[in-house]
Amino acid sequence: MQVAVVKYNAGNIFSVMNALRRLGVEPLLTDDADTLRQADRVVFPGQGEASTAMDYLRQHGLDQVILSLRQPVLGICIGQQLLCRHSEEGDTECLGVFNADVVKFRPTNHEDKVPCMGWNMIEPVVNPISKKVNPLLKGVADGGLHQAAGQGWVYFVHSYYVPICDDTIATANYILPYSAALAKDNFYATQFHPEKSGSAGEQIIKNFLEL
């Protein structure tokens, strides 16, 4: 299996590549359009600022490449946010895969700290028709730093979030409930960092590789 990691001006890419290696996959870091299109899986990770990242993607034609992908794609952290319509960060028009906008956390009291940083529970959304969680999240309730019925613990670092929407497949709560993970067609995304989330995160990456 060839797994391509999108090469662009965003941080934390090598942590993702190391997480893939721990699962026996040797990822390819690339910004080549043909290589990305031909890969079996594509990971779109990163930490950074939305407008700077989108400017880079557009200048290098990667925005259209990402939108053209038909294999499973996993956006992580800012990767999830860039797959949405718009971000308040820099008033940025994004890729528009998910029908949602990205907004900034607004503290409601002195105890609310932004950015949100640390471990938090996610709760997978059960599909009302299939009565199952999204395949990306299969088995997550059995892993993570801690355990709770129907929930998993994962690691977050972010100041902006995606409100709960039709594409939400898992929620988290920090200041207010929001989307911890999204899915639409062949695109999947997590606001948290599965590569830093212990056994729960490893399970999510494994699930992605098996989609």
Task: Give each language-model segment a name.
Residues 1-4, 186:
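Extreme N-terminal starter segment of soluble prokaryotic enzymes
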Residues 3-25, 195-200:
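N-terminal beta1-alpha1 ligand-phosphate binding loop
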Residues 35-36, 65, 181:
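Structural alpha-helical scaffold elements that stabilize or flank donor/cofactor-binding regions
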Residues 39:
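An anion/phosphate-binding loop that grips the pyrophosphate of nucleotide cofactors and donors
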Residues 43-45:
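Structural motif
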Residues 48-120:
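Cysteine-nucleophile active-site neighborhood
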